[in-house]
Amino acid sequence: MDLNRIIQALKGTIDPKLRIAAETELNQSYKIINFAPSLLRIIVSDHVEFPVRQAAAIYLKNMVTQYWPDREPPPGEVIFPFNIHENDRQQIRDNIVEGIIRSPDLVRVQLTMCLRVIIRHDFPGHWPAVVDKIDYYLQSPNSGSWLGSLLCLYQLVKTYEYKKAEEREPLLAAMQIFLPRIQQQILQLLPDASHYSVLLQKQILKIFYALVQYALPLQLVNHQTMTTWMEIFRTIIDRTVPPETLQIDEDDRPELVWWKCKKWALHIVARLFERYGSPGNVTKEYFEFSEFFLKTYAVGIQQVLLKILDQYRQKEYIAPRVLQQAFNYLNQGVVHAVTWKQMKPHIQNISEDVIFSVMCYKDEDEELWQEDPYEYIRMKFDIFEDYASPTTAAQTLLYTAAKKRKEVLPKMMAFCYQILTDPNFDPRKKDGALHVIGSLAEILLKKSLFKDQIELFLQNHVFPLLMSNLGYLRARSCWVLHAFSSLKFHNELNLRNAVELAKKSLIEDEEMPVKVEAALALQSLISNQAQAKEHMKPYVRFIMQELLHIVRETENDDVTNVIQKLICEYSQDVASIAVDTTQHLAEIFGKVLQSDEYEEIEDKTVMAMGILHTIDTILTVVEDHPEIIQQLENICLRIIDLVLQKHVIEFYEEILSLAYNLTCHTISPQMWQLLGILYEVFQQDCFEYFTDMMPLLHNYVTVDTNALLSNPKHLEVLFTMCRKVLCGEAGEDAECYAAKLLEVIILQCKGRGIDQCIPLFIQLVLERLTRGVKTSELRTMCLQVAIAALYYSPELLFHTLEQVQLPHNPGPVTSQFINQWMNDTDYFLGHHDRKMCIIGLSVLLELQNRPPAVDAVAAQILPSILFLFLGLKQVCATRQTVNRENHSKAEKVDIEENEEISSEEEEETSVSAQAMQSQIGRSEEEDDDDWDEEVLEETALEGFSTPLDLDNSVDEYQFFTQALLTVQNRDAAWYQLLVAPLSEDQKRKLQEVYTLAEHRRTLAAGQFHI
């Protein structure tokens, strides 16, 4: 390859004027052998301009991601799709580690992504040498190679981070070498606090975290090595951050490597404690380790964390994520006697001076509220922000301490009440007090000492603050109303005041963060309080209008959920405003989808999805109002059209759900047109969404079968889609759905003249069976299509089987089909599939002109049917049991649980918990039933009903016994062949089936007579 030519093309991609020509040049070259290795040479060359190297790195990353994995040609095609040539792959494997070591950061990040893909596909099979290569550079005396080699090792560990234990063997073998190596390396680096040294330490910590965060490899970490690691973590957490970092702006300090290193050390110890070191909360393989961890390390680490909290109390700077992880660790320590004993003397100071301080309104909150209230709302309601927030972690620690340790709650409540009752206290501290009390609402509402005082607390301290001139106090007061919305009010006036104040804040307050909190409070009060719901009934239209305004302005997903819940609460009232509401939501959705920044902001996707869910809820609520559905249809079709036009595939599932709800009772001409549009989209990019399309396609077949059959194009579209799925690479789950749709069509159209379709359906499923089928579900589903065809017309099926020519599978197809069916009868699960199989076998045994293949399996037919009836009996028994259990659960009265740990129990907690876990594990293993759970459960596909699933449909017991009686009366010799193989037990079971069939016949006749 001509390197200069590639360099010029890459340079052209940076220039808007040359970009199209440059991209065309690259797209014509990338398949040429040696192109990918040439990109790597450009990337590592110091003689090439940096932007070109960066462009080359991005191009190589995209190539490796797309073309490194081996790909097979589509069915029926012989040309293999493009893959990077093996010679090129080998060159890249030989040089990419060096490339990562030598490259600057912005290029290195692209190369490490390449490396992850390569390791995922090639290690250990094609590339065991990567271990030796990384190890070589880790041992190099040149420290300049250490960061790159550690990044390579990180990619190796990340590849296996979430894999099951049995799949991690290649990694664990490699870590036998690497773990001692990086431990030794970090020990050497610890005394050096320079930026590069701490950067290396941080990377080693990230490797360790990825290794242990999902499973702790006990074969790699014995007590001695773990003790060394824990001392390393303790040292890093405890050491002083260089004082010169205080010169950096506070907003930028968390990104400094010294704080990041501390964060990762804390992340590790918190994870180890939570997942492996907390007796009573670990799986049995970690029982011994958890006892050792708690006894050996937990208190020592906690001592350092208490010191960090004290530094924060003394107003020293602590990075937010460090504080958060410290809270997470202490949260685990609260429940164990040994750690609680150390924590107990400090818990009041921690609660009042640290946790409380973190939970108060701060300068940065005020700044954001004033400068960008919409961003303030986004931050407060972002679950990802919550995950990393010290405020959330502090809240959790306080909640656990108050719940588990009896001395914590009364002292903290007294502290908060003192603040709330003193008019001279800083308003921000009042916010903190309300925040604390609201966070403990669930506990307070269960404690008789406190729950009777809550109503008075709301009346005296919350209602007045809803009228405060400070927006953040009004918002917090709404939040507290939300927290206590399930309170049993003794004075109806207080409840009315609460709901009125929430409504007033929603409709009249001028500050958007207050409106959002008021919306959540109002919805929660309405959902929890019947009187509140009734009281707000006259205002539903105004409330909905205001909520729509808020959603339009803030694009907040939580408010979208409020609308959704209120629609459910006021379903009758909402019907009258459903069209206006949906029209508003559709306008907001269109605005969001067509905004310039849509693709860049994930929140917009979440919010747009929330709108679609809300419209879906409206459709469900008004399903009994066809005149409203008709008006909503046009609005929804515009939304569907917009999503399909813009190919926003992340919303395909939601718009298909809308279309499904629009076709549940009738199907308009416009909805039939949508079928054709969906078919075109399906051909382009909806291939993997077939399972999401299935409920809608099922409606097209079952809701208006006359319209389906009135236009041959409709059936052709459905068959073509099924064929594409069954002949493509959609995966066996989707293929099961395609086969199910074919079965539904056959059963729905029995006796309605689709004879010309049956051979096409049969050929398709039998050809699929000749290719490799991994799951029994797909195999039985394909067989079921043929069984449905047998029920539709035995003559047509066997004529088709005689005519079918299957590729790579010579020989009579009829006998292959019958034999496969007989071999697989025990794989038919759920009610419908077993019923279909019984009906099919009944048709088979009753045939007068039987193919020889049926005679050959005579001995298997009745035993198979009896086995299927036994399965049906189990399904029915399980359903009855589940119904009884659900009924009994519903009748249980909630009992207040006292979850505090008494001092006498403390020392025994971990031992008894483990003993109980061990006993539970044993009893579960010993209580194995002969029947797998999956045999008892309905299959997912059974939700797609057929005429056989209706209450007044063919009864399988009567169908079978009638068929067998017919044979007995008409063909005694054949009857003897069928019953001769039966054992005495099977004959008894056959008689039970006869008895049950007669009982069902009598019941049906009685119902008919009534």
Curated annotation (Swiss-Prot):
Native source organism of the sequence: Mus musculus (Mouse)
Xref: PANTHER family: IMPORTIN-7, 8, 11 (PTHR10997), IMPORTIN-8 (PTHR10997:SF26)
Name the UniProt record assigns to this protein: Importin-8
Bias (Polar residues): 910-921
GO biological process: intracellular protein transport; nucleocytoplasmic transport
Pfam families: Cse1 (PF08506), IBN_N (PF03810)
Residue ranges of domain Importin N-terminal in the record: 22-102
Gene3D superfamilies: Leucine-rich Repeat Variant
Chief site of localization: cytoplasm
Described function: Involved in nuclear protein import, either by acting as autonomous nuclear transport receptor or as an adapter-like protein in association with the importin-beta subunit KPNB1. Acting autonomously, may serve as receptor for nuclear localization signals (NLS) and promote translocation of import substrates through the nuclear pore complex (NPC) by an energy requiring, Ran-dependent mechanism. At the nucleoplasmic side of the NPC, Ran binds to importin, the importin/substrate complex dissociates and importin is re-exported from the nucleus to the cytoplasm where GTP hydrolysis releases Ran.
Biased amino acid composition, Acidic residues: 896-909
